[in-house]
Amino acid sequence: QSISCAESCVWIPCATSLIGCSCVNSRCIYSK
């Protein structure tokens, strides 16, 4: 199950990567 982190990563990396989100198709996604 993937959850949107309400952040995009088109120009900058995901700040939410600190809590486990990753960049997928220009969106920050959290996948368990």
Swiss-Prot record:
Disulfide bonds join 5-21, 9-23, 14-28. Contains 3 disulfide bonds. The keyword Disulfide bond applies. The keyword Transcription does not apply. The modification Pyrrolidone carboxylic acid is found at residue 1. Keywords: Disulfide bond, Knottin, Plant defense, Pyrrolidone carboxylic acid. Expressed in midvein, lamina and periphery of leaves (at protein level). InterPro entries: Cyclotide, Cyclotide_bracelet_CS, Cyclotide_sf. One of its GO terms (biological process) is defense response. Probably participates in a plant defense mechanism. The presence of a 'disulfide through disulfide knot' structurally defines this protein as a knottin. Belongs to the cyclotide family. Bracelet subfamily. This is Acyclotide phyb-M.
